[in-house]
């Protein structure tokens, strides 16, 4: 990922209290195409809300020009949790 994009993603994440930003899914596996969304796994600062998570998602989509999903470890479904944690790569 280009350094400028990485910095932009991390700046947006910081505005919403998101840390430890990681990518998982088809982008992390190198299987993405132009229709693929980008899946982000984040840790949110204490006191942050779903509004922060939603704002983060909207701003990332605007910046990247692609659909984005943002989840926390708590928000991961049990059946995919171990796979996501295994394949997640830091931004």
Which positions does each model-derived feature cover?
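Basic nucleic-acid-binding interfaces
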Residues: 10, 48, 89
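Helical scaffold of the NTase/Pol beta-like nucleotidyltransferase catalytic core
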Residues: 1-21
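Catalytic metal-binding acidic patch
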Residues: 25, 30-49
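Short hydrophobic/aromatic patches at helix-to-coil boundaries
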Residues: 85-91
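Metal-dependent nucleotidyltransferase catalytic core
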Residues: 3, 44-75
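A general structural signal for well-ordered alpha-helical segments in protein cores
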Residues: 6, 20, 50-53, 77, ...
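Conserved beta-strand core positions
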Residues: 21, 38-40, 68
């Amino acid at each position: 990922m280009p350094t400028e994009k990485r910095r932009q993603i991390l700046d947006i994440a910081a505005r919403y209290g998101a840390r430890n930003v990681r990518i998982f899914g088809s982008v992390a596996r190198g299987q993405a195409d132009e229709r693929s969304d980008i899946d982000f796994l984040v840790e949110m600062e204490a006191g942050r809300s779903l509004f922060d998570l939603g704002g983060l998602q909207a701003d990332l989509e605007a910046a990247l020009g692609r659909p984005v999903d943002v989840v926390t470890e708590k928000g991961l479904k049990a059946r995919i949790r171990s796979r996501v944690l295994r394949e997640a790569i830091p931004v």
